[in-house]
C-alpha cells in the first residue's frame, strides 16, 4: 500500500473534509458550539517553529458560534494526528506525546497576541488504525502513578484527555453513516482496510456507490486512491 501519512494529509488538509471527520468524532455539544463551516487550516511551521517532532499532522481552528465576553470571536484549536502503528499494541505514552503538540499551540497563540491573558481551548484528536484497536491510555492521568490511591492529587496534576478515532473498530454501517462526503469516506475506508488486500476486496461491495461518486465527481482523487492501493 501507499503512504498512509500522505493519504491522510492530502484528504484531510481540506477543511471541508476535516469538518466531516470532526462532526463524526467530537461530542455533539461541541459540534453544535463550533462553526465548522469556517474551519481553518493553520500553518504548522508558524505554530511549532519548525520542530518536526512537536508538530501534529494537521492543525485547525474553528470559531465558536457565540462571541466571547469581550465581544470577540473565540476559537477552539483542533490538532488532528494520524497515528500509524504497525505493532500489536498502541504506544503507551501517547497522551504525553500529545501534550508536546498542545504546548506549541498555546505558545503560538501567546506570540500572536502578547496581550492576551487566556489560553485557547485545544482538543486533541488521534486517528488510529492499528491492527488490533486502541488499548493504550487515553489521558495523562492514566499514566500518572498514585492517583487512584490518593485521589486528592488529581486536582493538582495536569491532565490531557485524548479523543481517539479508532478506525479499525468501525464496521461498514458505522463508517457509511458518518457525515463524510465520498472522498474522505473512501480515505477512512482505505486507512481501515489497507493492511490486507483481502479485506479491501471483501468490503468493496459496501463502498461501491461511494467509489462511483469519487470517480464521477473527483477523478484526480480517484487516481490518487488507485495509486495508493497499487503501491
State where each predicted segment sits.
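Elongated, amphipathic alpha-helical interaction scaffolds
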Residues: 1-231
